[in-house]
Amino acid sequence: MEHTPCWIWYPGDFELRHSLKLHARRQERDYYRLAIWPVYDCWHSVRFFRRIELTAPEGLTVLARGKGNVGVDGKLYPFGKEIPLSAGTHEIVVEVFREDGLPCLYVEKGSLSGTEGWTAQPFAGEKLPVGFSPLFTLPEQDPEVFPFVYEKLQPVEVIQDERGTLYDFGRETFARVFLEMENQPELTVCFGESETEARAVSDCPLIETVPAGTASIQFPARAFRYVFVPGEAKLCLRVEYERTPLKRRGRFSCSDRLLTDIWNTAAYTFELNSREFFLDGIKRDRWVWSGDAYQSYFVSRFLYMDADICHRTMWALRGKDPLLQHLNSIVDYSLYWLLSIWEDYQTYGDLDFVRAIWPRLRSLTDFCLERTNEEGFLIGREEDWVFMDWADMDKDGPLCAEQMLFIRALEAAADCASLAGQDGSRYAAHAERLSKKLDKFFYDEEKGAYIDTYASGRRNVTRHANIFAIL
């Protein structure tokens, strides 16, 4: 985007900020379910740096979301004021502090607008090329607010009976609901994926209570098909479908109408879950899981071919350093994340993204290497979840399928190191050593297959390791 004006921030901060907000929205009746892993926030105090040599005088106007100043060759200026720059070399340092959100800046025009040459640093730590998103190119925008788009929805059916009023929107949606009322006593509003769920007032997981006398109210966007209002109520209900501004590029049709309908339903379901990040589900959990996201990256290539939502998800999943545990607390989900960076480069060829995320890729890879046993196999600790699948597997000790995934993740990390101009030979060497040990520890000649683990002595065989061996 070079000199195209856009909002810029410390790389990964936009994603961490919106991940923080997203993971605090899972509501069940009158309480909230919190994510079961550490959730990180953006840095709130950031410096932005730019050195430029101008061949002619020009003006510099910096807008910011937050407090701070614009430093030009050591002299400080306020935000929003045009600063004259003479021809020659200038050192620009912009400081932005925002206690309640994402610190970011916007250069309105000229040679300093856009992303080219700008780096950022949270006062301490690594100075990196700035982060940005093609979604934020206008000065009036605030990257603290995600730019969803909205479409009005009408119920396909309204059913009134002695129990209340049921609004049916025909299919699952993710929408915000507005109510307007006059002289209305206290009101209950239930949301459900099925009619049964919506009508079950005492058990409905998504329920709102509207105080008596309320003239209008807006409920946060959530997943539902049905809205049920018990009892008699005189109100005007308005619904707006909330979605991410993604362009659908993939299309499918065939002579089999049912197959076409299945594809379109799958595409719509995926659209519902393509929000700030790829979600595992729009109602439960409404969280971002690395294993689910890994599958979403593949699907996205056939439906959107949009790198931005993939990169947002990867930044959000990775979090900040120092690492406290595996991503989503699951060992294999850390490995899928490492794989996803290399595969993303193979898809989109975005070298700048690989270089920007490299420090966090490196620290996650090192974190995994620190959690290996004497043979070099990756093992789960007491606080780790060794998942791989819900299937009944022998997970006592190093898991064969996980070692295969670990080897491929190390190879991917080594490849990404090369792309970032770094030395990844240690990762490649460890992967090679493990490859040579796999058959010795995990292959059962008598069974003609790979076993789950050697530690228990049970020599149990499931399909996972053997499928991974083929892949």
Question: Where on the chain are the PLM-derived regions?
Answer:
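Active-site acid/base region of carbohydrate-active enzymes
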Residues: 236-238, 245-265, 271, 278-295, ...
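Non-transmembrane amphipathic alpha-helical segments
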Residues: 407-410, 414
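Extracellular/oxidizing-compartment recognition motifs
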Residues: 1-276, 309-310, 352
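Conserved, well-structured interaction surfaces
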Residues: 323-326
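A generic structural signal for solvent-exposed, polar alpha-helical segments
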Residues: 13-15, 49, 124, 138, ...
